[in-house]
């Protein structure tokens, strides 16, 4: 039996990444959306949606990244999204990196805070994301990332 609505897994770490992800919510109209973030209190902003909380980790903590990657893997396994959308950082990269394993397409929207160059996660995500976006026109390139406007 085919799904009635597409399933979206929206992923962002804390702070500005989460704020930017919240600005993309109108694009998910009509979809079944689940969220992944690093702070449980963000659940108040997405009532009626499933919220998964993963540990926050940086590139400086390999063990922390491994634990977070395992958490993201299990979330993808349970949610089985059609699409993964993220504004970064580490949890979003992990989700984009693994999305294809589950047959999901992935979209990376690099944070508007990265005005001079793409974030490290954003540069890495370009290899795996079906849609790879920057919010700064001067950072766009012919092979990606592409510019389609800003969310803030």
What are these regions (language model features)?
Residues 12, 30-71, 138, 148-151:
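Conserved nucleotide-sugar phosphate-binding/catalytic loop shared by glycosyltransferases and other
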